[in-house]
C-alpha cells in the first residue's frame, strides 16, 4: 500500500516536472501507431517512479541484512542505472541510445554477480525435503534437512520435480559439484539477460509492460511466500528457503509501484516508463524466480515476454534469409508480436512476403493490451497451479 501511494503521489509531480523541462518522447512510428502523433511529447523515463516507489518502502520496512533483499535492491538500482543512461542518451545525444553491446555487458555482469553471490554466500541456502518411513506404523514422514547449499531447481509439471544441475555432470566425478555451480551461474546470467530484454520489448503500448509485470509479480509473490513458510513448503512438498520472506515484502512493494504507475501509464498514457523502468522490471522478475529456484517456470510466468523475444528473433533471422535472395521476407506483419496486431490493411508494402499474415484487420491498442494481460493472468495461474499439479 505504501508503494502504491508513493507511486501515485510522486507520479503526478514527476510528470509535471518532466513536461516543464520538455523531457519527453520524441520518436514515434505513426505508420503503425494511429495515435503516434498524440503520444509525441509524452514524458518518458517514468521508470524512476517505479524505482523510487519500490525502493523507499523496502529501505524503510525490509531487513537490509537479508541477502535476498540486498540482491533485489542491487538488481533494481543496477538495471535502473543502465536504463537511465540509455534513455538519457536517446533524448540528448543519439536517438539510438546506449549501444546494445554495452547494455548486454551490463546485464551479463549483473547476472554473474547474482549467480556468484548465490553460490558463495553462506546465507543463500535451502532446506530440502527428506522422506522417512516410521518402522512402527509404516507412516511416511516428510521433514526438512539442515540448511544446505544446492543447485536444485524445480521442474514444472513433473511428479518428482527436483533437478540438481550437479547431477547433469555426474560423469565428472568429484568435480560435478563445481561444474553444477558454474552451469548455474551461466544459467542465471542468461535468464537475467533474457527476461530484462523481453520486458524491454514488451514496453511498446500504453500499460502493456506495467500490467503484465504486475501480474507476474503477484504470481512470484505467492510462490515466494509458500517457499518461505516451512509448514506450507512441507505440505506442498517443495523446497523451504530460509529468509525468502523478504522477497514477499519486496514483491508487494514492486507490484504496488507498478499499479500506481499504471494509473498514469494506462491508455492514453501520461508517461512512459522507458528503459529506466523496463530493464529493472524484467530483472526483478528474473532474479526473484532464480532465488526461489523456479527459473524453469519463467517460460510459463513470463510467457508474454518470451513471445515478444521469440517474435523478434524469428523476424530478424527470416528477414536476413530473404535479403540474401533479394526478397523481402517476414514471419509476422510487424515485430515485436504486439505490433502485428495493430497494423492497418494496406500498411504492409505489396512486395513483402508475410509468412503468418494474422490477424486480419487492426485491433485497438487498448484491446491488444487487455488481451495480453489476460494471457499473463492465465499463465500466472498456471504457474501457481504447478504447486499441486505434477
Predicted region positions:
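Juxtamembrane linker/hinge segments adjacent to transmembrane helices in membrane proteins
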Residues: 14-36
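Juxtamembrane helix-capping/reentrant segments at transmembrane boundaries
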Residues: 28-42, 94-106
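Short, amphipathic alpha-helical segments
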Residues: 72, 92-103, 149, 180
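Individual transmembrane alpha-helix segments
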Residues: 158-190, 196, 372
Amino acid at each position: 500500500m505504501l508503494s502504491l501511494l508513493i507511486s501515485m503521489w510522486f507520479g503526478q509531480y514527476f510528470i509535471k516536472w518532466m513536461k516543464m523541462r520538455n523531457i519527453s518522447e520524441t520518436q514515434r512510428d505513426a505508420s503503425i501507431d494511429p495515435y503516434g502523433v498524440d503520444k509525441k511529447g509524452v514524458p518518458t523515463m517514468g521508470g524512476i517512479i517505479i524505482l523510487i516507489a519500490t525502493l523507499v518502502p523496502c529501505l524503510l520496512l525490509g531487513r537490509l541484512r537479508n541477502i535476498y533483499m540486498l540482491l533485489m535492491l542491487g538488481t533494481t538500482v543496477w538495471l535502473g542505472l543502465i536504463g537511465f543512461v540509455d534513455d538519457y542518451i536517446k533524448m540528448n545525444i543519439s536517438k539510438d541510445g546506449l549501444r546494445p553491446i554495452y547494455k548486454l555487458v551490463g546485464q551479463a555482469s549483473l547476472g554473474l554477480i547474482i549467480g556468484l553471490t548465490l553460490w558463495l554466500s553462506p546465507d543463500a541456502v535451502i532446506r530440502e525435503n527428506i522422506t522417512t518411513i516410521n518402522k512402527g506404523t509404516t507412516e511416511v514422514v516428510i521433514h526438512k534437512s539442515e540448511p544446505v547449499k544446492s543447485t536444485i531447481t524445480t521442474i514444472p509439471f513433473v511428479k518428482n520435480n527436483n533437478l540438481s544441475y550437479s547431477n547433469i555432470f555426474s560423469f565428472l566425478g568429484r568435480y560435478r559439484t563445481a561444474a553444477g555451480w558454474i552451469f548455474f551461474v551461466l544459467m542465471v546470467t542468461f535468464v537475467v539477460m533474457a527476461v530484462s530484454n523481453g520486458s524491454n520489448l514488451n514496453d511498446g503500448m500504453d500499460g502493456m509492460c506495467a500490467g503484465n509485470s504486475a501480474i507476474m509479480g503477484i504470481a512470484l509473490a505467492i510462490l515466494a511466500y509458500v517457499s518461505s513458510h516451512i509448514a506450507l513448503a512441507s505440505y506442498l512438498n517443495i523446497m523451504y528457503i530460509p529468509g525468502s520472506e523478504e522477497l514477499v515484502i519486496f514483491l508487494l512493494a514492486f507490484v504496488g509501484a507498478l499499479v500506481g504507475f499504471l494509473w498514469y501509464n494506462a491508455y492514453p498514457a501520461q508517461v512512459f516508463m522507458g528503459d529506466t523502468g523496463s530493464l529493472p522490471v524484467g530483472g526483478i522478475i528474473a532474479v526473484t524466480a532464480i532465488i526461489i529456484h523456479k527459473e524453469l517456470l519463467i517460460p510459463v510466468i513470463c510467457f508474454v515476454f518470451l513471445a515478444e523475444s521469440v517474435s523478434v528473433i524469428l523476424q530478424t533471422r527470416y528477414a536476413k534469409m530473404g535479403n540474401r535472395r533479394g526478397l523481402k521476407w517476414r514471419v509476422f506483419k510487424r515485430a515485436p508480436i504486439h505490433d502485428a496486431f495493430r497494423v492497418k490493411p494496406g500498411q504492409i508494402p505489396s512486395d513483402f512476403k508475410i509468412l503468418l499474415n494474422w490477424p486480419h484487420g487492426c485491433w485497438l491498442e487498448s484491446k491488444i493490451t487487455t488481451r495480453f494481460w489476460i494471457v499473463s493472468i492465465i499463465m500466472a495461474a498456471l504457474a501457481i497451479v504447478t504447486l499441486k499439479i505434477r
